[in-house]
Amino acid sequence: SGPYSSTDNPKHTEQETPKHLEHFNNYPKKIYYKYNSKGFRDNEWPEDVSDVIWCVGDSFTLGCGQPQNESWPAVLEKLTNKRCINLGQDGASNDTIALRVQEIQKVYNPKLIVIMWSYLHRRRVNGIDVGSDKNDFGDDADIKNFLKNYDAVNSLPTKIIHLTVPLSMYNDGDELMKQSERTAYGNEISEPIKKKILFLMKNNVTEVKQ
């Protein structure tokens, strides 16, 4: 617990995105990161989780740079009047997100999981989330890896709602990070699949599995 988390600290802002430093230093809302006994930025879980909404993702789900009550799981909880459990993790790759969803299904038999997928270039290598996998690098590889994770969770016997992080955030990134915002034109992935996933990623479209 503390006032900073991951990229949400003045040192990172000064080094990586100095043009935002004034905004950072004059942000009007008080930000504090408090984690529950399971290691997530959320209140303690209720004893009965049979009818909760499970929210899985990266720092966008955790609510990096936001008060806890303004994270999207917290807002969803207010809108639905149902307990929404925040399983956001700073820097989580889609590999980690998919593994977490499968574990939730195995342990809790959930009724509904909402996934906010992360950037395609992030990978889980040797059990650690990294910015990219140098041994499996590029747009085609990233899309194939994403589809692997997408299919793995979409085959689970529960309702899944898919969301994505806003890729416009890459405007402040370097060339390596921008790769996942570009269209891939390799031959290994069919054009209909490419169009579907790129439309989903670009427009933050919600797709509900019935």
Model regions: which residues?
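N-terminal secretory targeting modules
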Residues: S1-W54, V107-K111, M116-F137, N154, ...
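Serine-esterase "nucleophile elbow" of acetyl-processing enzymes
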Residues: N36-D95, R100-Q105
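Surface-exposed cleft-lining segments at the edges of enzyme active sites
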Residues: S59-C64, Q89, I128-L147
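Conserved beta-strand->loop/alpha-helix structural units within folded catalytic cores of enzymes
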Residues: F146-L156
